[in-house]
Amino acid sequence: MADALDPRTTELVGIAAATAGHCQPCFDFHYKKALELGVSLDEVRAAVTLARAVRAAGDRHMDEHANRRMTTAVPAP
């Protein structure tokens, strides 16, 4: 299963996951490995941009969910 992604893609996914998860040591680890594999800064920027968009959508949906819960006083499922 680990071989399903090539090493460059694996590191870009790691960069995106680290960005979305706010893990600076994880980002640095995958960033260094990605550069060693020849990943371009444009590719890194694309992964970070995508991660930020995913994170922002999740944050927005969670805020909306919390607001609904607080205004309806309905117990959580």
Model-assigned labels for residue ranges:
Residues 1-77:
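Hydrophobic alpha-helical segments
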